[in-house]
Amino acid sequence: MQDKNEQMAIKIAGQVAQSGGRTFYVGGLVRDHLLGIENKDIDIEIHGVPADKLKEILSGLGEVTVMGASFGIFGLRHYEVDIAMPRMESATGRGHKDFEIVTDPFLGPEKAALRRDFTMNALMEDVLTGEILDFFGGRKDLAEGVIRHVNAETFVEDPLRVLRAAQFAARFGFRIADETIALSKTMDLSALSMERITGELEKALMKAERPSVFFEELRRMEQLHTWFPEMKDLIAVPQPPSHHPEGDVWNHTMLVLNEAAGLRSAAKEPRYFMYAALVHDFGKPVTTEVIDGKIHSYEHEKEGLPVVSKFISRLTSETALAKYVLNMTELHMKPNILAAQNSGRKSFMKIFDRSVCPEDLLLLAKADYLGRNLTCRDYPEENVLREMLAVYNDLMSRPYVQGRDLVAAGIAPGPLFKEALDYGHRLRLAGVPKEQALPQVLALIRRSAGS
């Protein structure tokens, strides 16, 4: 069943046809249609109708919005349809905005498709007839799972295409053509904005079953150094084979990332969680050493925090994400260690209380444990960790001593307040009911005030 946006696209195409033009679905919509993937982002391109006539047609169908006048892109209010005129682009500088755009309604479909990045994205589908135009072998590449650039000359003008190739490879499980890999090696990514980088990175992290492919392909393209140098530093950092049969820290991180992708739907903060999985072992390159013939990475979870902070700040100014990721990095080893050591309840409560998100911390611990190429997929620590988390959540759901309780007892806010509330919180973690905890807190205040 067609939604209102598809219906509007067909209406536009009908009006355009009456004026002697043609309307095509373009870009990812055609690709996803052929792959059997739902895509509600409707992009259409209008050929054979001048801009003034197109605006007249659109005005008869609704309120026209100009989304990019210089790009020849329009919309209709209340509809999610991008309506574009054919255009040619040429780079005028290194920045992503440094392009000269020339719109030409009579450019022709083949020349218009020439500006597309990959053959699979250069396919065009006639909105009215369903005819698919394929000028560069896109259907064959799509069927064979190949990501191949359309035109070498135009491809190198937008360095973001290096990352787009990598994220498409991760999302669709495709391989990048050797000639596209070779071309990507020559491109300079330094002028890209952090927003464009994170846009492609997060598509891989959030949409791919195997986000590791994104980084594996960037490694093949020799493009880790500009935006992801910390990832490059993981390569060839050894790990003890007895605990890590998968090999170096790079291999481990790739496996953990894929395990995390299988768990992200269960995470409270799935996007943050995927970043945490990515960076959790960034401390190993700076701590790994061989002592008496054995490989150790002592304190890597703490020593990695400045490395993680630098990495995150390069990609985003989102403080909540940084706080979450740093906290998860510091604590990522604790749950499995406590479970393996049969630690007491108090130790678990302390760790959960230090965590920004205990539920996600356990998911990260699971991904870390399973990301080791183990033949056995059992995770024996999971039951006790879940039991301890249930205890913690139960304690946090109970009534507890708050500031207003102290005020009601006649205690004026002052220096002892925080100390008293901290003590009350420790009693809460120990399972002491509020009615028993409050007298103990008040007694502490009296003792402290009298000393």
PLM regions and their residue ranges:
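Catalytic cores of the polymerase beta-like nucleotidyltransferase superfamily
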Residues: M1-S451
